[in-house]
């Protein structure tokens, strides 16, 4: 049944949901990649759709908003109230290393964070916020499409405008390729409620070089990561 934030019914969502931050990007993904897509949520403008990919697989796509608090609400409700088993975040990140280029795809197998949300979940202990191994493996295998992607830890920040830029030097030292705002929270929610999750990001801006993409491009393109996400679902179904 409907929740305070999702006006759908059980069965409206597929067991796999792709989740961009921007609900308009969710609409673009549904229009571009899914057949017979229908709207299943519009509460607060957080659009959600369910359709079929390549005539073979029912898949849903829905926005999750910005930051861990927002994405945690939506992912929790999808899992506990609508039977969703797998979440794939498809979003943007900022690069912190010179060798990472604009529009590259980064598969986040783990997520460091300055947020305290997972400590609240885990009785004030550190929780290893990691993606499901099988989902990571299939995303890597989906690179056979000819799409280049890199795999690394990423960093989920609570603040978009950080007051301490020296933290980027620490991230670079530890091999982190990108900064975003949600993955650690999504991995925590998935672990708490027995689901699986993965984050795939496209580099939308570069913290070192100050290069950036424009909002319209982020909304309607970045299709390589979407292809990896969708094809990884088909690979999973073959197991």
From Swiss-Prot:
One of its GO terms (biological process) is purine nucleoside catabolic process. GO terms for cellular component: cytosol. Disulfide bonds: none annotated. The record marks 218 as: Important for catalytic activity. SUPFAM superfamilies: Purine and uridine phosphorylases. It is an enzyme of class 2 (transferase). Phosphate binds at residues 21, 25, 44, 89-92. It catalyses: a purine D-ribonucleoside + phosphate = a purine nucleobase + alpha-D-ribose 1-phosphate; a purine 2'-deoxy-D-ribonucleoside + phosphate = a purine nucleobase + 2-deoxy-alpha-D-ribose 1-phosphate. A purine D-ribonucleoside binds at residues 5, 180-182, 204-205. It comes from the Bacteria. Coiled coil: none annotated. The active site is at 205 (proton donor). Its EC number is 2.4.2.1. One of its GO terms (molecular function) is purine-nucleoside phosphorylase activity. Keywords: Glycosyltransferase, Transferase. Homohexamer; trimer of homodimers. Catalyzes the reversible phosphorolytic breakdown of the N-glycosidic bond in the beta-(deoxy)ribonucleoside molecules, with the formation of the corresponding free purine bases and pentose-1-phosphate. Belongs to the PNP/UDP phosphorylase family. This is Purine nucleoside phosphorylase DeoD-type. The lineage of its organism: Bacteria, Pseudomonadati, Pseudomonadota, Gammaproteobacteria, Enterobacterales.
